[in-house]
Amino acid sequence: MALLQTSLIWAVYAIVVAILAAVASVFIYTYQTPRDRCPSVILTCIVAVTTLLATVLLVPVDVALVSSTINPALGRRQDWATQSEVDRILLCLKIVYYFLYSLDALLCLIVIPFIYFLYEEYDEVASETEQQSFGQRFWAAFKYTVSFLAIVVVLFLVGFFVPVAKDGDGGGLDYFKHLLTENRGERALTFALGLLITIGLCLYVLYTSTGLALFPITLIKEGPSVISPTLKATTAVQLCSNRERQRQLEGRCRGNPGLLSSKDRRELDTLVREERTLIRRQRLADEAHGKHQNWLMQLWLKFGAIFRPFQLLSGVIFSLLALIIWISMLLTTIDKAKNSFCKQRCGYILGHINVFNPINWVFVQSAKIFPVDYVIFTLLVLFLFSSSIVGISAVGIRFLWIRIFQIRKGHTSPQALLLATAMLMLIILALNYSTSMILAPQYATYGPQTFCDRELSFSEKQPDCSRDKHLIRPCSEVADSLAAKQVCTPSVVSTFLNRVTMNFPFFGAIFFWAQFAFLGIYLLVMVTALLHSPKLDERQLDEDAEEAEEESLLANTRGRAETTWEDITSRLRRQNEVDRAGA
């Protein structure tokens, strides 16, 4: 029974990971620019996003496995759940967690920078003329990546030595063996993870809070777009007025622009440029309305119009969900600030829940019927992940106030896609902490586990509360009952995250106070978005129209060049055949 139950839990996790790979692929293919597709960049981004989401969504599996050892109705362990069996489950989970966390760090700090530099080193002309080989690109990218490799080594060395600073002889091999037996290697990974979560929290506070406020509102208050009939009519009127003014100027000079004054010539040149822009804008609007499009695109546009009311409904639902998330985070942070038994000394760890948290309650109740809690947790994580993407799209990739890259659907360069993926990886690490320790702390620590709070008689191996249901209590971290210590098993993720804040209290303080910054920015952005009416970015629209026109011209030129090349090669082939026949 135990083997079947654990196998089913892992099977559900495998299905979820496959779904995550599909979600990551859709995200990457939606945002990348079609003109600059790079297979190595696409594959790296998909693997990175899938791995991080798989790390976060291991939490319900962790909770389900440790909770499966308990009979919550009786507050005692299952008959098969011996201590050795529980230790085996925990060891398996630890191996998976350490593998995923190490892979996350490797992808974020080594692989993504390497692929970024590898793409930057690519020179299309030099590659076609065989002046640049793949080995040269690889070596140049590796030289730039060495600095990131050094950062990783320094991170692990700091985490390896700082917690166990000792005097005396510590430079030999025996000392390293002693550190490993004391599990200092695990502390090094803990320090590296704590630092990455700290960096991720800065991005999480800025981007996820912004996206959490904007995502539902953009679904409800959809701004004017190129599909708007009003914009199409306005463009037609502007184009008509422009051409009328051009005719007036051309009539004044009778077709000879040299007869015009310098002021009129400048006006005519401006009108000609404006006419080209308006024509491109009109063509883009026609394509958005399905004109000159294939039947599949026209069908998609019709479906979009039909499902517009459902978009409004989903916006309202997401707004309520975002508000519940905000309230749950606020309640937990207040609870931690008031009732944490160790305050800043251990990162405001909460012994047990003192304030009702709606999201935590939903997860604890749904965890009694696996995989209901897994479905809800997955939807919550994907909602926060989508909010992070919306936040990055709205704010852009910036250095201080300078926008370096813009993230837009169908217009994101490979470099921007790699940077956005690295940012999302760090954000998801911070999200792992927030969902486990802030949104649903009781669920992520013990799930639905309970224990029988009564004295153990000499003839009993476990307390029996079958007749005393009122003595069955939920497990908590400060339960001082001997029965609780024998029965309750904390999840691996809660143990690992609490170890970060216990061993390095400054990380815990940053993690805690960053939540208040998140709540404040969300409130500010939400109020601003409600009061501000969305406007159409005409400059961006004109750039999109110009880019589409360039793409069309390049495609036509490429087609003509290929046709010409085929004609030349076929002519040479026929000439060679004639020469051979004559010979």
Swiss-Prot record:
GO molecular function, one term: cobalamin binding
Chief location category: membrane
Gene Ontology cellular-component terms listed: vacuolar membrane
Membrane topology summary: Multi-pass membrane protein
Span list, region Disordered: 541-562
Keyword Cell membrane: no
TM spans (from-to): 8-28, 41-61, 95-115, 145-165, 188-208, 312-332, 347-367, 375-395, 418-438, 506-526
InterPro entries: LMBD1_LysCbl_Transport (IPR050854), LMBR1-like_membr_prot (IPR006876)
Keyword annotations from UniProtKB, A to Z: Cobalamin, Cobalt, Lysosome, Membrane, Transmembrane, Transmembrane helix, Transport
GO biological process: protein localization to vacuole
Compositionally skewed regions (Acidic residues) per UniProt: 541-552
Subcellular location(s) of the protein: Lysosome membrane
Protein family according to the UniProt entry: Belongs to the LIMR family. LMBRD1 subfamily.
Known role: Probable lysosomal cobalamin transporter. Required to export cobalamin from lysosomes allowing its conversion to cofactors.
Protein name, UniProt field: Probable lysosomal cobalamin transporter
